[in-house]
Amino acid sequence: MGQNGALQPIQLVIITGMSGAGKTVAIQSFEDLGFFCIDNLPPTLLPKFLELVKESGNKMNKVALVMDLRSRDFFDHLFAALDELAEQAWVIPQVLFLDAQDSTLVARYKETRRTHPLAPNEPPLEGIRLERKLLEELKGRAQIIYDTTGLKPRELREKIIRQFSSHAQSGFTINVMSFGFKYGIPIDADLVFDVRFLPNPHYIEHMRPKTGLDDDVSSYVLKWGETQKFLEKLIDLLSFMLPYYQREGKSQLVIAIGCTGGQHRSVALAEYIARHFSDDYKTVVSHRDMERRKDIHR
């Protein structure tokens, strides 16, 4: 109940995405957050199920559902249900789409020795390509997209908890992510900025094993005139754009900052940008590839 006894809107998260991208970990994470969870609810049952939830009188005010292509009537009914829910005041629906690079999904299938549900008699990559094509429109309608490439199950769980815990549900979130171009562009990024033109601490021997979180590396990256000019122009651009993204109803904006390996320059700049906007927006900073180069002692 609200402060005046009014029913609070039901928070509905529909978890979908690529097979092998982490939906099982996701639904378990929502259970840990106190959500009422159902795996593989047919879209035809969604309106009736939500009516029952509504009639419960806020006894189930947080609901997470896994929906995927195991339901053969998936698209015929899901899009219609989403359109109808968008017009209702008593429910706040969000689509969380889990994705990963094809090579990562293939590796996960090989590790578990599973076949792809859409192509059980074909190599996993054939099913992955078909599924990606079928889910393209749904991905375009998702409010939140997670790229689980390189994420361990624990890291995906932590990401979900940061996003969906009760104290975090205060609207628009800016997720500033550093990454290395050598490992691929994050597929969940809304905006991508390339900082490989900046001076590289990798070529300074004592900085090579460190990261952009270390003070001396950060100071080195930020001290250059071209860095300061870039940050000035980028922050000016983002300051202009962010209110419009927020107005469009996005719940999060993923800003990806990339350098060669994702260890030095992109890390320092991602931290700087997140700090700059933290007074006006809820911000989260993450470093996708920061530990990779350290692990191989490049």
UniProtKB/Swiss-Prot annotation:
It comes from Geobacillus kaustophilus (strain HTA426). Displays ATPase and GTPase activities. Keywords: ATP-binding, GTP-binding, Nucleotide-binding. Belongs to the RapZ-like family. Disulfide bonds: none annotated. Transmembrane segments: none annotated. It comes from the Bacteria. InterPro entries: P-loop_NTPase (IPR027417), RapZ-like (IPR005337), RapZ-like_N (IPR053930), RapZ_C (IPR053931). This is Nucleotide-binding protein GK3066. GTP binds at D68, L69, R70, S71. SUPFAM superfamilies: P-loop containing nucleoside triphosphate hydrolases. GO terms for molecular function: ATP binding; GTP binding. ATP binds at G17, M18, S19, G20, A21, G22, K23, T24.
